[in-house]
């Protein structure tokens, strides 16, 4: 059974996705189909959760839009993802940042920044 799952996951096309950790601020370009037209929509926010592995991995991204918190669960290997850009690397001591849901204003997106060394 495990071999069958690995075979299916190996054939799944995926977007080259950088390493995403809770606390990172990301911008995800998603393809949106409206009627017969297709356009790109940017969703920028803080990764508050990741779960799963392989082809079934998902991340939860949270942003504040006009004073209202918006969360979106995004499958990492979705064919609707055009690109993923990490804007800031956050330093989080937890794997799930659900406590950000209770915060308001700028504090709702405040996560300490983590220094990342560039490797060539």
Curated annotation (Swiss-Prot):
InterPro entries: Ribosomal_bL19, Ribosomal_bL19_CS, Ribosomal_bL19_sf, Translation_prot_SH3-like_sf
PANTHER family: LARGE RIBOSOMAL SUBUNIT PROTEIN BL19M (PTHR15680:SF9), RIBOSOMAL PROTEIN L19 (PTHR15680)
GO molecular function: structural constituent of ribosome
Protein name: Large ribosomal subunit protein bL19
Name of the encoding gene: rplS
Function: This protein is located at the 30S-50S ribosomal subunit interface and may play a role in the structure and function of the aminoacyl-tRNA binding site.
Any GO BP annotation: translation
GO CC annotations, alphabetized: cytosolic large ribosomal subunit
Keywords attached to this entry: Ribonucleoprotein, Ribosomal protein
Keyword Ribonucleoprotein among UniProt keywords: yes
Pfam families found in the cross-reference section: Ribosomal_L19
Protein origin, superkingdom: Bacteria
Keyword NAD appears in the UniProt entry: no
Similarity remark: Belongs to the bacterial ribosomal protein bL19 family.
Lineage of producing organism: Bacteria, Pseudomonadati, Chlorobiota, Chlorobiia, Chlorobiales
């Amino acid at each position: 059974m495990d071999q069958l799952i690995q075979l299916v996951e190996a054939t799944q096309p995926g977007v080259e996705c950088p390493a995403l950790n809770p606390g990172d601020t990301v911008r995800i370009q998603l393809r949106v189909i409206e009627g017969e037209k297709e356009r790109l929509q940017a969703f920028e926010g803080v990764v508050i959760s990741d779960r799963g592995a392989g082809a079934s991995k998902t991340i939860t991204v949270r942003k504040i839009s006009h004073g209202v918190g918006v969360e979106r669960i995004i499958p990492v290997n979705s064919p609707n993802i055009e690109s993923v850009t990490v804007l800031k690397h956050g330093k989080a001591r937890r794997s799930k940042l659900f406590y950000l849901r209770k915060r308001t204003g700028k504090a709702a997106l405040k996560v300490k920044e983590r220094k990342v060394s560039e490797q060539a």
